[in-house]
Amino acid sequence: MQVSYLHWKLKQEKNMLWLYFDKKDSSTNNIDQSVLTELMAIIRGIAKNKSIQGLIITSDKTTGLIVGADIQIISQLKTKKEILAFTRQGQSVFEELANLKIPTVALINGLCLGGGLELALACDYRIGLEDNKTRLGLPEIMLGIHPGWGGTVRLPRLLGAPRALELILTGRIMHPYAAAKLGLIDRVVPLRQAERAALYYASTKPWKRTRFSALNWRKLTNYSWVRNLISAIFRRRLIAKINPLHYPAPYAALHLWQQYGVAHKAFLQEAESLSKLAMTPTAEHLMRVFF
């Protein structure tokens, strides 16, 4: 079975569904409202289809999985209310993806940045292609904003706060082996092994860590009393390099995590914070420079 939408193509092979992103009339895959609307409909359809036992999301373009949100669209939104609505739309779609009862895999070829990585973080597994073009990161801070589709919540959950904050506050972009070393992706494979690896993970239920797991230190770093200590360290580093009056985004991201951690309510606060930052002169200037 193969079904096509405007921006997405679905291909079901037995009990596995391949979802290919190929944004219409665009050389790269970026995310706007129409992409999100289609993706929400697709995910809700998957949730109702009992014949689908695994989902693999990948790109049908050679330029990469997703380069992020459509910055031109964001720059055209004129009010905080409009930006908040767009941000919450993306959060809702990715939350639906994260809540699917089947294993979900992001097969990353080429660029996976910003909103693209946030989509991948909403999946159970991430596989990176062994390719010089494959890059991952959350570079929003370079545009005077911070991640807004769950990145400030899901990344600290996955990596622990120190590693996640370093990536969020610097906008660092990594090749797949560096990402795998951090725990951001589960496996790096050459192209010839990509399909086999994706199918393996899509048929594997996510491992549930026990309370005694050695990896529980990541959860510990997000506890409220630990957040204050970690925030103080990162704030000192920021003050040594960045004036908060001229460049407020990293301070806003750090404050957001310190106050709300990785609790579910942090998603709304993330959206509220981003919508304020996007209206600042710094963000408006950096987005103009981007084009």
Model regions and ranges:
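Conserved CoA-thioester-binding segment of acyl-CoA-metabolizing enzymes
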Residues: 1-58, 95
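Amphipathic alpha-helical segments at domain termini/boundaries
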Residues: 2-22, 121, 168-273, 287-291
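Hydrophobic/aromatic residues within transmembrane alpha-helices
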Residues: 57, 70, 119-120, 179
